[in-house]
Amino acid sequence: MSTLMIGAATSEMALDAASLATGRMLEAPLRAGAFVIVHDQTPFCMISCDVIALTRDLVDEIGAGVAGTCGIPADNLLVTSTHTHHAPGTLPIYLNPRNEAFAQRTVAAAVDAARKAM
């Protein structure tokens, strides 16, 4: 008999007063959400982050973190962004550099959401 387990969770991305949104004001809490499905001991994870975009290096960091924390291989992971303009920049846009501190908080929140969804 096959087994199916499903879990979902979110983790907030902490903001500080110095964080500027990419194009607009900050309006609501920003989160990473994870949805985990384990079918016959094979795990799959989908993560969505409230950011404008995710660069390859951030996706790779999320993948490594999820693999190390949850045991879910990167090949079984889908990571996406909501493309909100109400979050600090996770990539350089025009003359604005990437907000490195927020980018790392995004990675941490994504991994934490996956951990909680397990």
PLM regions: where:
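Conserved beta-alpha junction segments in alpha/beta enzyme cores
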Residues: M1-M118
